[in-house]
Design a protein with these regions (language model features):
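Active-site-adjacent structural elements that line small-molecule/cofactor binding pockets in enzymes
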Residues: 1-306
Length: 306
């Protein structure tokens, strides 16, 4: 299948809106609850669910094998599969085997991770761009036995111009997260029309008895902006050092969708209008997975109308 055909097939399978499986950061959930969550999200009308991983605690591709088997049509993507969790050749083989078993239901999103994750497996992080390039090239290396002959889209976590250029050169697209819609527009222009652009969007739903959604969003955005690379990416979208230091309203509104289901949908639509093929709200998940799923079920009528 030609690269453009892979992208077109992925666009058709994913649809414009998916969702991240709402497991609280740094935690896990019993696999039976995850099966139930995936089935409920499928019944709610979501066509795609994204998961992630760090290093240790779980294996995202094993997780997807369970969830693919538990659902009928749902597309699953890794957002992201961490390159320090498995060798490149193993990642290729595992993804190809899943794609062979479940055609058109897998998107492999890869990310370079962080130095501490490389150190956890006794590896040198190196220069991120060179490390990621080397990993992608090793995925294509021949093995004995060969990997399954199955086609699936590969996309690359990319929030900056250099990693975005690598995504355009060696993969089927990019997976940015936590940036404003103006950055989505720049990324679409840089990628061109023939690459897949999947955007993760932080989402904070107004809940009775909880702090206001915008204030929860402000706290999360402020914490995220402590990462220098994200602060620099935000500056490229025109925000000032003062706005970043203050975490002002305009910055919060640009970096997170918050409020009612209709307001969340409007925030997602901003990215679709800017050129995203697919958007995935990332809920500020609490510890109860199935309660978080209830929130996504309430969101479904508004966001799936996009």
């Amino acid at each position: 299948m030609a690269p453009s055909s892979v992208v077109e097939a992925a666009r058709a399978a994913l649809g414009p809106v998916g969702v991240y499986l709402p497991i609280a950061l740094g935690t896990n959930a019993p696999i039976d609850e995850q099966r139930t969550a995936a089935r409920r999200l499928e019944r709610a009308g979501y066509r795609a669910v994204w998961t992630n991983e760090s290093v240790g605690g779980k294996d995202a591709l094993v997780q997807l094998s369970v969830l693919l088997a538990a659902t009928e049509r749902m597309v699953f993507g890794t957002g992201i599969a961490n390159i320090w969790s498995r060798p490149a050749q193993t990642a290729q083989a595992a993804a190809a085997q899943l794609a062979q078993a479940y055609p058109d239901r897998l998107v492999l999103g890869l990310g370079v991770g962080y130095p501490q994750q490389a150190a956890a497996v006794d590896r040198e992080f190196g220069r991120p761009l060179a490390t990621m390039r080397g990993y992608l090239e090793k995925m294509a290396a021949p093995t004995v036995p060969p990997a399954a002959d199955a086609v699936f889209p590969r996309i690359l976590a990319a929030n900056g111009p250099k990693m975005l250029a690598l995504a355009a050169e060696l993969t089927d697209g990019a997976l940015p997260f936590g940036l404003p819609a103006s950055a989505t527009a720049r990324m679409r222009q840089a990628l061109g029309p023939d690459k897949l652009l999947v955007v993760g969007v932080s989402a904070f739903v107004e809940e009775p008895g909880a702090a206001p959604a915008r204030e929860r969003a402000r706290a999360a955005v402020g914490a995220a902006l402590s990462r220098p690379w994200l602060a620099e990416a935000v500056k490229q979208s025109g925000f000032t050092d003062r706005q970043i230091a203050d975490v002002d309203d305009a910055l919060v509104d640009a970096l997170a969708a918050h409020g009612t289901p209709e307001a969340i949908a409007a925030g997602l639509q901003d990215h679709l209008a800017a050129g995203a093929d697919h958007v995935g709200p990332v809920l500020d998940a609490g510890p109860d997975l199935l309660r978080n799923v209830e929130t996504l079920e309430r969101l479904a009528p508004a966001v799936l109308a996009l």
